[in-house]
């Protein structure tokens, strides 16, 4: 993974404030596990409301977790005072997301002035085992 220098010295506060103010982030129960330049990890509880059978997480919340993880990682490298908008994201489901804990990790792979691209991965864990359940790419546009 490349090493990045944040353009906003207060990037961590900006990421927390912006993401945690979003109603869907609040509803999903996302909480930050790690925020570093170009990297963000979220934890999301697995609740019956986001599953299709009471156990396995439905694809929509998995895609949202990837989008938020990659987008937040991108936001760590954005200049102060700008916003980011998702212009593209892909989701590849790899395994059923079953467990009691769900984690998303976003890692920036390219950071330009107008576009930032991040890889996003999702993992489910339960009973001491963690498996990767999805992967994707997220492209964000910097909006002044």
Predicted segments, located by residue:
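Non-catalytic linker/capping segments at the edges of enzyme domains
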Residues: 1-43
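HotDog/MaoC-like acyl-thioester-processing domains
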Residues: 3-9, 96-144
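Hot-dog-fold acyl-thioester-processing enzymes
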Residues: 20, 45-69
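A generic structural signal for short beta-strands and their flanking turns/coil linkers
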Residues: 26-28, 38-40, 83-89, 100, ...
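Hydrophobic residues in beta-strands and at strand termini
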Residues: 44-46, 93, 142
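Hydrophobic beta-strand-centered segment that forms part of the acyl-chain substrate-binding groove
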Residues: 54, 72-103, 108
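Residue-level recognition of specific faces of alpha-helices
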Residues: 62-64, 83-85, 90, 114, ...
């Amino acid at each position: 993974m490349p090493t990045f220098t944040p353009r906003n010295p207060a990037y961590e506060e900006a990421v927390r404030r912006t993401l945690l103010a979003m109603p869907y982030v609040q509803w999903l129960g996302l909480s930050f596990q790690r925020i570093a330049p170009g990297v963000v990890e979220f934890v999301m509880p697995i609740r019956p409301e986001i599953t299709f059978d009471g156990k396995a997480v439905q694809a929509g919340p998995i895609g949202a977790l990837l989008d938020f993880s990659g987008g937040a990682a991108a936001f760590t490298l954005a200049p102060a005072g700008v916003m980011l908008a998702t212009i593209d994201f892909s989701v590849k489901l790899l395994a059923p997301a079953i467990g009691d804990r769900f984690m998303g990790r976003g890692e920036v792979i390219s950071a330009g002035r107008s576009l930032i691209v991040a890889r996003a991965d999702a993992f489910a864990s339960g009973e001491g085992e963690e498996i990767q359940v999805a992967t994707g790419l997220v492209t964000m546009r910097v909006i002044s």
